[in-house]
From Swiss-Prot:
UniProt keyword terms in alphabetical order: Ribonucleoprotein, Ribosomal protein
GO MF annotation list: structural constituent of ribosome
GO BP: any one term: translation
Protein name: Large ribosomal subunit protein bL33A
InterPro entries: Ribosomal_bL33, Ribosomal_bL33_CS, Ribosomal_bL33_sf, Ribosomal_zn-bd
Annotated S-S bridges: none
Similarity comment: Belongs to the bacterial ribosomal protein bL33 family.
A GO CC term assigned to this protein in UniProt: ribosome
Gene that encodes it: rpmG1
């Protein structure tokens, strides 16, 4: 089952991206390096619901 998740910047706590994942095949939380427009640099984004 695919669920919608938000990706939140780890340094400034702004929610920048919306994505989905399959919770059966990937039960752990997602950690992705993405661009943060507020900080204007690439930062670590963590899964939040």
């Amino acid at each position: 089952m695919r669920v919608k998740i938000n990706l939140k910047c780890s340094s400034c706590d702004s929610i920048n991206y919306l994505t989905s994942k399959n919770s059966k095949t990937h039960p752990d939380k997602i950690e992705v390096l993405k661009y943060c427009p507020k900080e204007r640099k690439v930062t670590l984004h963590l899964e939040s619901k």
